[in-house]
Regions:
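Hydrophobic core of transmembrane alpha-helices in multi-pass small-molecule transporters
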Residues: 38-39, 44-48, 108-122, 179-181, ...
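Glycine-rich segments within core transmembrane alpha-helices of 12-TM secondary carriers
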Residues: 64-67, 121-126, 130-190, 292-295, ...
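Helix-breaking motifs and short loop linkers at transmembrane-helix boundaries and internal kinks
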Residues: 82, 103-108, 120, 166-167, ...
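Structural signature of the two symmetry-related core transmembrane helices
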Residues: 85-100, 108, 150, 318-333
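C-terminal transmembrane bundle
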Residues: 114, 149, 267-270, 278-389
Length: 389
């Protein structure tokens, strides 16, 4: 890899005595790359050096923009066409753009595919979260919404392990994305969300899925449980609005207005802290792989902490407490930056900050799902997730 200093070279001779500059800009061919950590990288292959070094950050921004757009459109697709169809579209975008990205001849094509990967990648979590919550009853909504975070952290750890053993970026790209193709098999293994089918009036399909699940669990259901009049009497059939809910509906009436503003700030602040600590984690120690592993591993205790305490202490107290802990830890870690004698303390404080940020990240998903009514819930999660990016 090359740093900014390697983009200059010494001038061999100075004919003009007035010239004080002793270096001149060099070309890509003049650079010597350090292969002690990686054998190849996109920085070298796509020439993200010197006056083109900004492209590396730009394509990172494109990925985040894709995630933001994906939050919005995938939520709409999920509500209109079904959870599983939205999930399969996400699988197609991530696997297709990820695999093709390893063979792109130029950096602009690669950047566009990273954008598509961001769109599809966000569908994985959002749609899967909704499916997990809708597959269980109210008693297990919180537990289901929190447990799903743990495989997310484990996936990050696996990616770090792959990167440690695979130092060629093309091979790593393929190893990380080819297994995603296996997720197409979920179409045949996981049925559509019965709650979504009920909400869209497809009662026969919902009944078939629920009865199959009851049979597997040795449960018996009443014969008329999915009759329209029974559902209406028992208030089990979700009300369907005449018009599709929009972003503006999040601010009607007054109670929803303040609730939405509050949650928008929660999502924004939590996400900024979470991703900021994640991106900065590679600079904690000299070994970037160990840094990444520590940053990912600390998320798991954060999620487990939420599982054990939220049922007893509620959402708002835990969210407030963890935000204070995370914020103070980050401020303290920043004040200790550059002090070699306190480097270990800075790392510990950074990890405590990531612990709190990860836990907050999980809580805001569950909290939003519980705060907003059914007809506007998916719109709220999708739009807040879009705004946070």
């Amino acid at each position: 890899m090359a740093n900014e200093e390697t983009c200059d070279k010494y001038i061999e001779a100075l004919d003009d005595p007035k010239v004080s500059k002793i270096v001149s800009n060099c070309t890509f061919e003049d650079l010597i790359f350090d292969h002690s950590i990686v054998t190849s990288s996109i920085i070298q292959d796509y020439d993200f050096t010197c006056d083109r070094s900004y492209l590396r950050q730009l394509y990172g921004v494109l990925y985040m923009v894709g995630m933001g757009i994906g939050s919005y459109i995938m939520g709409a697709i999920s509500d209109k066409f079904g959870r599983m169809k939205a999930l399969m579209l996400g699988v197609l975008l991530v696997s297709g753009s990820g695999i093709l990205g390893a063979f792109m001849p130029d950096q602009h094509s690669y950047g566009f595919l990273r954008f598509l990967t961001g769109i599809g990648g966000n569908a994985f979590f959002m749609v899967t979260f909704v499916i997990c919550v809708e597959y269980v009853g109210p008693k297990y909504t919180m537990l289901s919404g929190l447990i799903i975070e743990i495989p997310f952290a484990l996936g990050e750890l696996v990616l770090g392990l792959e990167a440690y053993f695979i130092r060629d970026w093309v091979t790593l790209q393929l190893v990380a994305h080819i297994p995603v193709l296996l997720l197409f098999g979920l179409w045949f293994l996981i049925p559509e969300s019965p709650r979504w089918l009920l909400a869209t009036g497809r009662l026969d399909e919902a009944e078939k899925i629920v009865r199959k699940g009851a049979k597997i669990n040795n449960k018996e259901l009443p014969e008329d449980i999915f009759k329209t009049d029974t559902l209406e009497n028992e208030s089990l059939l979700p009300s369907i609005p005449e018009e599709n809910p929009t972003f503006l509906d999040l601010f009607k009436p007054k109670l929803m207005f303040f609730r939405s503003l509050n949650m928008m700030y929660q999502w924004f602040s939590v996400t900024m802290c979470y991703y900021g600590l994640t991106f900065a984690s590679v600079d904690l120690l000299e070994d970037p792989y160990l840094n990444f592993a520590l940053s990912c591993f600390i998320e798991i205790p954060g999620y487990l902490f939420c599982i054990f305490v939220m049922a007893c202490w509620g959402r708002k107290p835990i969210l407030s407490f963890l935000q204070v802990v995370s914020g103070l830890s980050c401020i303290a870690a920043g004040l200790l930056y550059g002090i070699k004698s306190l480097e270990i303390l800075q790392i510990i404080l950074s990890l405590i900050g990531k612990f709190g940020a990860s836990a907050c990240f999980a809580i805001v998903y569950v909290y939003t799902a519980e705060l907003f009514p059914t007809v506007i819930r998916n719109t709220a999660i999708g739009n807040f997730d879009y705004l946070k990016k």
